[in-house]
């Protein structure tokens, strides 16, 4: 579904990605983790061409993302992305935020778009908030609207860039539940997150990045219990203690 071949990206003199290669199969859930500045978010942004790579190529479902001739509207309809900031239009209701792109970009009739949007709001558990504005919604509700908005374009791939990092702790689980449901329905997903419980329970594979490269990857059980690389073990030791202060064992995440 996704083939990333030796891509590199710099911002000025700062090398953010260095010859990164990664394949993601259809229906697979891959979690990217690593310290801040390791290139995780930039990698996501390259997958749907929010950032252009300097070398290498990316192919998603047969579409070469790195081809400058690619139709970006068509590409981004196939690759949904959800950010840590919700990016909802404040002057539009939840329903209107979801229907805007299908109506404007793909020409979906408004009534059909509204019916589909209501079904998506039901799916993410907030159908009763359809006519509310973002300012009237909690952070968790806004993020669920953002997920529904991305799903309205019927993407084949969903990218999540730290979707819970801006949320209060009590709102995190409601968003993770929606993401877990998507994974179980077979959605291909690449997720940047520090929620290691989600990673262990939902991911098919975990990829650890540092310094713009992939340091290590593996299935969750192996990754948490017997990480090979010292940098990986150091990162896991810190993040698992942060998430579970009563335990320091790498295999302790529930």
Annotate the PLM regions.
Residues 1-220:
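ABC family nucleotide-binding domain
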């Amino acid at each position: 579904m996704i083939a990333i071949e030796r891509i590199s990206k710099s911002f000025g003199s700062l090398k953010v990605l260095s010859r990164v290669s990664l394949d993601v199969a259809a229906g697979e859930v891959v979690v990217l983790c690593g310290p801040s500045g390791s290139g995780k978010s930039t990698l996501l942004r390259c997958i749907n061409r929010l950032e252009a790579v300097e070398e290498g190529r990316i192919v998603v479902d047969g579409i070469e993302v790195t081809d400058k001739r690619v139709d970006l509207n068509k590409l981004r309809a196939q690759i949904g992305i959800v950010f840590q900031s919700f990016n909802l239009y404040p002057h539009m209701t939840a329903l209107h935020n979801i229907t805007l792109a299908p109506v404007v970009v793909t020409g979906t009739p408004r009534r059909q778009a509204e019916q589909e949007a209501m079904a998506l709001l039901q799916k993410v558990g907030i159908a009763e908030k359809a006519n509310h504005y973002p300012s009237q919604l909690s952070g968790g509700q806004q993020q669920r609207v953002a997920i529904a908005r991305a799903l309205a374009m019927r993407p084949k791939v969903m990218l999540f860039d730290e979707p819970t990092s801006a949320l209060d702790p009590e709102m995190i689980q409601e968003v993770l539940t929606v993401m877990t449901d998507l994974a179980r329905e077979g959605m291909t997903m690449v997720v940047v997150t520090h929620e290691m419980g989600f990673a262990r329970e939902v991911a098919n594979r975990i990829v650890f990045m540092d310094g713009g490269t992939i340091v290590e990857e593996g299935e969750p059980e192996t990754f948490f219990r017997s990480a090979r690389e010292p940098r990986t073990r150091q990162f896991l030791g810190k993040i698992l203690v942060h998430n579970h202060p009563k335990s320091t064992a790498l295999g302790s995440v529930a």
